[in-house]
Amino acid sequence: MDAASSSLALSNIKLHGSTNTLNSDQRISSLCSLPKSRVTFSCKTSGNLQVRDRSTGLVVSCSSSNGDRDVIQGLHLSGPIEKKSRLGQACCSVGTFTVGEFALESQSQAVDDKVGVLLLNLGGPETLDDVQPFLYNLFADPDIIRLPRLFRFLQEPLAKLISTYRAPKSKEGYASIGGGSPLRKITDEQAQALKMALAEKNMSTNVYVGMRYWYPFTEEAIQQIKRDGITRLVVLPLYPQYSISTTGSSIRVLQKMFREDAYLSSLPVSIIKSWYQREGYIKSMADLMQAELKNFANPQEVMIFFSAHGVPVSYVENAGDPYKDQMEECICLIMQELKARGIGNEHTLAYQSRVGPVQWLKPYTDEVLVELGQKGIKSLLAVPVSFVSEHIETLEEIDMEYKHLALESGIQNWGRVPALNCNSSFISDLADAVIEALPSATALAPHTSSTDADDHDPFLYAIKLLFGSVLAFILLLSPKAFMVFRNNFLLNYTRIYGYRGERSEFFWVRLIFT
């Protein structure tokens, strides 16, 4: 967009700390070239400015001839807004929209937006008593256990059955890391750090935390957002790479809530679905890895071992989950950054946390560790690349189980890169991501699913829940009945659908009954 087509008449502009007041025909191109100052102004658009709601304000962004880009922060531009001058000739555009001819009024017409940021995460049990209900919430998610449509009425009863069965072993894991997950505490700290980072960038926000499977649930965060009167929302899942089982599941919950609420359905929302490509994230990961490599006697001989959370192959091949491609690209970007710093270590990627008898993304972390030991690798640096917070999969699975396996397999020197947590450069980059996402905020697109549609019929839902609960109760109390049901269920399912180990539905059937 050239300077002529992007110019914007402004009125009621005052430079703080200066006696100068700009004329009403002052152009944005002049504003961008101003020295560092604090600017407030108000405006109202008319004409053919292509925005969804002409009553909304504008976010002005400036780009310079050297390729840099910056944003005059704030919505409705009622400031105060800090803008640092850039080197090179500057031209401007308004948000991500096309600008034509439009007028501005001298009186203030815009109302400040109240910006909210919603951080989404998995959640985790904070005490051992929380483990079983947490697991129930996890397995009751249809994006985790993808039952065939014919058997969806079993979702909640089977979640109860599986969570009861798995709780004792899971409790052992949480007991080994202090009796509960630190995920909520760390995520709360990240939220506070992000709020401060945004404030330093002259963006006043409320930051909320919404967990998918434990407190504070996403539903609780949304209710607080409504009470606070938020007028523009950025949703930031704390998963660098997108998967239908993480970010996808959380977005599905949001879509359902927004569809059923008049206030929420009109709330402008921007969702950052993935952010693994961001330069700040890549550099932050490289910083941590570079620091850990220095702890080895011979850093150049260390094998860099990326361990990512796995998903069933069927998610990728049948459901179109981009997780595998995004993960591989993420690893490539991190290694490119390290290479630019003169670090050329060998590296490999493996996937952890698989369960059940069917194929997950390969190679598997435990198998690769054994192979590396057999090949004579003596030094290894584990990098948990799916996680930005410490939790059971880093503190127990990697630090205990995989470390023990690695040392047992012949690896002598073990190191592990810490999760990003509240790393300052990482948090600053998340703040930039939020600011960049604001101009694209629109009402959340409606989405319907057959599962949600069934839930709207209370009579049908009650029948399904009753039947499934009775069946699960019988199976839980009677091992013989459980085995009979298992054998007949698998036999009939195979006859109907055929044995295709990559089918996500068949995977969960086998997972539940084997």
Curated annotation (Swiss-Prot):
Lyase as UniProt keyword: yes
Compartments in which it is found: Plastid, Chloroplast
Pathway participation: Porphyrin-containing compound metabolism; protoheme biosynthesis; protoheme from protoporphyrin-IX: step 1/1
Catalysed reaction equations from the record: heme b + 2 H(+) = protoporphyrin IX + Fe(2+)
Originating species: Cucumis sativus (Cucumber)
Gene: HEMH
Annotated family: Belongs to the ferrochelatase family.
Top EC class, one word: lyase
SUPFAM superfamilies: Chelatase
Entry coiled-coil feature ranges: none
Gene Ontology MF, one: ferrochelatase activity
InterPro entries per UniProt: Ferrochelatase, Ferrochelatase_AS, Ferrochelatase_C, Ferrochelatase_N
Protein name: Ferrochelatase-2, chloroplastic
Listed GO CC annotations: chloroplast
Keyword Zinc: no
Pfam families with a match to the protein in the record: Ferrochelatase
